[in-house]
């Protein structure tokens, strides 16, 4: 901070300090604690980005973000179609948690009671949403365990359920769907169903291109898997035609 010029120091000090009772009590430490995000490779360290820190929170965000440690940049991507003039919302906490848990964490860490559309829902709507989000999280563990133990049919059923619930909660973001598509690929690949495995890989590639640069390791790895498996499908089709 002290190596910044006066203009950039002032920009940092304009940011919110959720740990100060009054604006005049803002501190540099409080601003950093409120606005910093952890990096992927440096434990206990984070980055403070002036523009990114301006995004408000929603438990049904319209944007997502990914940190590139090599470039020391945080990239922001749309998590769904966004209307002209619609506010861009990030997410500060685990959006699979219950409304009560999310609100308590946001109040404790950031000093505000969340009034987003998800948290403002009442009655049965709120209960259904909490149940859906809890089930989405549970199914993630179920899919992992079923793939690990070779129960691929059960894993596929859980994958489809998870996709359905994510869409209902408007949480089917490209990064989450990318992971789900990769789970689907693993199921079909282990079962020896080359055509369906490639279908899932194509979905992986499409989702990855919505939030990753094409030169990143994940994108290159998916393309490599596609290149390896497409010829096998052609060979299988030729054999089937001969039969």
Regions found by a protein language model. Name each.
Residues 43, 192-195, 231-238:
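Short, charged low-complexity intrinsically disordered segments located at boundaries
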Residues 165, 195, 207, 214-215, ...:
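Hydrophobic stripe of amphipathic alpha-helices that form coiled-coil interfaces
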Residues 159, 201-202, 208:
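Inward-facing hydrophobic residues that define packing positions of alpha-helical scaffold repeats
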Residues 170-174, 206-222:
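Boundary/linker segments of alpha-helical solenoid repeat arrays
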Residues 223-243:
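Alpha-helical linker/edge segments of TPR/alpha-solenoid repeat scaffolds
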Residues 54-191, 196, 221:
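C-terminal SET catalytic tail plus cysteine-rich post-SET Zn-binding segment of SAM-dependent SET-domain
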Residues 1-62, 109-118:
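Catalytic cores of histone-lysine modification enzymes
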Residues 76-78, 212-214, 230-232:
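Eukaryote-specific, cytoplasm-facing alpha-helical/coiled-coil scaffolding segments in long proteins
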